[in-house]
Swiss-Prot record:
Region (Disordered): 162-194
UniProt biased composition (Basic residues): 167-176
GO CC, alphabetical: cytosolic large ribosomal subunit
UniProt name for this protein: Large ribosomal subunit protein eL15
Protein's gene: rpl15e
Family indicated by similarity: Belongs to the eukaryotic ribosomal protein eL15 family.
This protein's UniProt keywords: Ribonucleoprotein, Ribosomal protein
Xref: SMART domains: Ribosomal_L15e
Transmembrane segments: none
Gene3D superfamilies: Ribosomal protein l15e (3.40.1120.10)
One BP term from GO: cytoplasmic translation
GO molecular function annotations of the record: RNA binding; structural constituent of ribosome
Amino acid sequence: MGMYKYIREAWKSPKKSYVGQLLKKRMIKWRREPVVVRVERPTRLDRARSLGYQAKQGYVIVRVRVRRGGRKRPRWKGGRKPSKMGMVKYSPKKSLQWIAEEKAARKFPNLEVLNSYWVGEDGMYKWFEVIMVDPHHPVIKSDPKIAWIAGKAHKGRVFRGLTSAGRKSRGLRNKGKGAEKVRPSVRANKGKTK
């Protein structure tokens, strides 16, 4: 087995391998950090590389913390029955991974989101690492594998659900029977998709 295969096998079931102990120590530190943190190197090198990361200029790795569970809505100031406040049971129609990608994109408006992957979770939070690319960097523009991201069509791609997590959340992984209301979009089908 090559190095990447060993890493992949260890991350398949983190609690059973050495990764579990590492995550425990790491999360103690991560909880105290800001929501969006730029990191030097990917935590899961095998996953990052399979999703398009390269150790060259123009690529940035960002770790994002997202609160687990349903959406926490702001409390109304006006008077009404507590049952009519609309604070609970309104879940976002987005995955936590997609939300994490959007948080990263807002923090670094000059970069584009390429992809992301899970790196840990506890009872309250989930952590994702987001691979971001600088579309204006000469190294990126001259690399035929990633130069497409510099095109106008890919500007703000994460906010339009064009990343892998976004497409999955929109139901675009499915086709055929049961996926009639998925295309062309959720909005075009008046929200019947979800």
